Amino acid sequence: MGKKLGIHAYGNVGRNVARIAKGFGMEIYAFDAFCPKEVIEKDGVKAVGSAEELYSTCDVVSLHIPATAETKNSINYALVNKMPKGGLLVNTARKEVINEAELIQLMEERTDLKYMTDIMPAANETFAAKFAGRYFSTPKKMGPRLPKPISTQVLPLPSRL
């Protein structure tokens, strides 16, 4: 494929994304402020020293950062604008890490950028109307749906055994 994939946060999900991407022949880079460089490189992934370096190096960036006070709105105009022409931002983290207003502004200015997310952003209607063909989202985190909370189904089990 010849593309460079950047993994922003090299936890369990990031590691598995790297493992799968290797099968597509992608060159894989990762940045994680809390994961030692040696751990990343042991997996055959190139560790970079900053988020800025990751975004400026990679054609595709896959987000896996947690939503914390420090990361809220951290994926912003300045950071995403570092991506090469034709860049794709994939958010499988939390929608709160994206500064939606700044991403909309950037995508208006840079018609080469694309954005995919597995959780519908608050500004979904704006993204969908303005960026058809460059934006995709699913309505919510996908996965099994239970009719009631798991705790109400599992906790009573011992009394029925």
Listing of model-derived features with the role each one plays in the protein:
Residues 35-129:
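Rossmann-like adenosine-cofactor binding region
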Residues 32:
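Conserved acidic E/D residue at the C-terminus of a beta-strand in Rossmann-like folds
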